[in-house]
Amino acid sequence: MALAVSDMEIYQHMTPQMLAQRQTLLNASQAVVLDTNLPAESIQYLADHCTAPLFADPVSTAKAVKLKPVLGKLHTLKPNRIEAELLSGVKITDDASLQKAAETLLDTGLHRVFISLGSDGVFAADRSGQQVQLPPLPGAMVNTTGCGDAFMAAITWAYLQGTDLTDTAKAGLAASVIAMESAETINPAMSEDALRQRAAFSK
């Protein structure tokens, strides 16, 4: 990608009123994925009224604060290290504080958290007490645009496949590296088969 212009104004049209008109559709979904480009009141509406599992991407530290009031109503959260610090109130300096940040987030009622660690991979934890830290998968870096979105899409897909925490984290890492290997924003080689092969699921 050489240049991109993003007009975020469209998100302002995604009001609670608009979402209410689509409540039946939302509740019939297997999962609903949101990010913090949505207005805070719309995020709150989804947290209060959507019965489908909610997967949330904090997007940035400036916008992540919108999730603080609704953390306990989310199913899955995918913050990076800095966003996890902001939302948990725990400064992450080592493995112990990383685990503490994840546990603090889960204590809100959140079901799963996947903390992106950049070149250190990902740390994942769930309410059952399971925790796993995985390194990034090897790959040729061509373009990092869309890697985070690919990770979020993959962990949502993996949840719908019924995978465990470890394989879900593997799916996220696999999608990220597949996305990274193409000059296109969405790698044409991205597929369910490619994801399964790259992730090397344990089951």
Model region roles, listed by residue range:
Residues 1-131, 191-194:
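Ribokinase/PfkB-type carbohydrate-kinase core domain
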